[in-house]
């Protein structure tokens, strides 16, 4: 059986700085991995490559045995979601709006907001946030709750595999 994710000889440079060089990584079904290292060691860069935010300068990525093209849309389509260390949220928007922004499936160009809201309410309940309205402004939440919203966003988008970037920064 093929690994869920296989990265081969991944290299990424930013000008003269080499962030990742020749990195090999394999993730099999049921495994959990942690990338541990000093600030600036290239952990976030490697995750952003897997998520499709950065294209590597060298190497290949396979998901479920198929070589991937790079890009966030491709990663989401293949079930890879990322929870960023810096929130990807717009303060003046609601929880639901922040989660579906740019990602909600649309029929005939329209978002089924009611269905999206119901799915988000179920995810809020799953994360112990049943008292929080999906219509609440995102900036009314504390930092830990906002981090949970980032995880909920990845699950809402159908992420099978989740990349958590410095999640412990917000967990107290």
Regions found by a protein language model. Name each.
Residues 1-172:
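Glycine-rich phosphate-binding loops of nucleotide-dependent enzymes
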